[in-house]
Amino acid sequence: MYQTLTITAAQGPLGYDPSPGTFMHSAASSPVYVPTSRVGSMLTSISYLQGTGASQGTHSVNSHWSQATSESSSYSSSSPHPSSRYHYSPSPPMANGSTRDTGYSSSLAVSGRDQYAPLARPLNGSYGSPYTPYMTPQLTSAWPAGPFDNTMLHSLQSRGAPISVRGAPGDVLDELPESRECVNCGSVQTPLWRRDGTGHYLCNACGLYSKMNGLSRPLIKPQKRVPSSRRIGLACANCHTTTTTLWRRNTEGEPVCNACGLYMKLHGVPRPLAMKKEGIQTRKRKPKNLNKSKSSSSNGNSSHHITMTPTSTTSSTNSDDCIKNGSPSQNTAPVVTSSLMSAQQTGSASPDSNILKYTGQDGLYSAVSLSSASEVAASVRQDSWCALALA
């Protein structure tokens, strides 16, 4: 940069007055402090002032930039001798509205006061510049306006609190669960919301019913069974009773008592009114295990004990043999009864008074009348139940 300035200064004539102290101010009046060492090195390498020894002495003594004290520039844009130091035309003068007619006519030739004036900004003013200002003193927005800016963006920035942006409709439903309603039963409260095939909301009960059965949940609840306390006014349509253990219905749907209902079910005809009883006949239900044990014990006892009452000596002998050798597997037990107890005490054996009567549990034996002892013995041998008695 400085080499270019040196070359151009050596080739062309100077466009400013090389009088001593033209580019310099006193140290007290200069608003910017420039180090002496840097200025001295720059002045020794670049010869801005030529042709007078006074100017050289000034550089060596003051070591400051000198500037013309005249308020007007040495050349302007209308000068017929433009500066040969730069290859571009000088900037046009800028009218800043001040009483002074001087301004920036070149990037190098400026007055001493105007050179540092932009550095000191007034209270209500702005920095001066030879270029077109790109920002106005009063900003209308916090950022420069672009091709896509509009007033909505600026109003958003000027607002103190940010605008809350609402989400999708699904988010609103999630935030407001009370706004949902079951399309089947109309319920608004449920532990879990479900959806049907079309996307409508269902409550948990309707959703599960539809999922398991493939049908919509019925809204009509099934009729509960009326408790017995509410059936006080009922009466049987057949016998007109009001007390029963179980209410039934006939083929016509009328309430009937348990007895009339069972009779109609078993016989197919209405129960006769003559069979009506004042009280309710109930049966005592016993455990099945106890009944079986009692029946088995009674059968065993009856098979071992055989009671016979003989009316003669011969029959008593045979009966004793039967008692001693009686088979326990026999199911029938013969019973011999006597019609004349006095004959047994006297020991008289009249043919008319000797009567043997055999009675079986199943009625296999009927009353048998034997007139003599030989017939009794023959009958005993023929019977199968006393076969071991004569062996």
Swiss-Prot record:
Q: Which Pfam families match?
A: GATA, GATA-N
One example of the protein's molecular function in GO is: RNA polymerase II cis-regulatory region sequence-specific DNA binding
Composition bias of kind Low complexity appears in: 70-89, 292-319
What SMART domains does this protein map onto? ZnF_GATA
Matches recorded under CDD domains: ZnF_GATA
A single BP term in Gene Ontology: cardiac muscle tissue development
Please give the GO cellular component terms listed in this UniProt entry.
nucleus
List the biased-composition ranges (Basic residues).
282-291
Compositional bias of type Polar residues: which residue ranges? 57-69, 96-107
Give tissue specificity per the record.
In embryos, expressed in the presumptive heart mesoderm. In adults, widely distributed but predominant in the heart.
Zinc-finger ranges (GATA-type): 182-206, 236-260
Tell me where it resides.
Nucleus
Q: Does the keyword Zinc-finger apply?
A: yes
Role description = Transcriptional activator that binds 5'-GATA-3'-containing motifs within gene promoters. Regulates cardiac-specific transcription during embryogenesis and thereby cardiogenesis.
Q: What is this protein called?
A: GATA-binding factor 6-B
Q: Which organism is it from?
A: Xenopus laevis
- Its gene name is gata6-b
